[in-house]
């Protein structure tokens, strides 16, 4: 998608596939987006970006992997603790993000 800010190198992350409710999509932020932090607390994506000191002029361009309004991965920053694989994980989704050479 044009205008997405994707880190220059490749990233690979793994997610607990059975926790995904919809079809994950890569997109930019939308109203109502949230991420789950360690301990299970939810944080509005807007507040997460402020706390992580993501520059305001970049926030609308940061690439996200989203399951509805639940952010699975703020690409280049953090994955949601909700989707992390653990001892009870049966199926794993591997996601690779690589910026295409121009």
What do the PLM-derived regions correspond to, one by one?
Residues 1-102:
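Basic, glycine-rich polyanion-binding accessory segments appended to enzymes
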């Amino acid at each position: 998608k044009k205008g997405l800010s994707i880190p220059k190198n490749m990233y690979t992350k793994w997610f607990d596939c059975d926790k995904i409710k919809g079809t994950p999509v890569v997109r930019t932020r939308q109203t109502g987006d949230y991420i789950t932090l360690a301990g299970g607390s939810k944080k509005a994506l807007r507040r997460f970006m402020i706390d992580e000191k993501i520059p305001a002029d970049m926030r609308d361009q940061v690439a996200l992997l989203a399951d509805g309004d639940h952010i699975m991965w703020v690409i280049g920053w953090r994955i949601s603790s909700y989707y992390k694989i653990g001892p009870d994980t049966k199926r794993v989704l591997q996601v690779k993000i690589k910026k295409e050479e121009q």
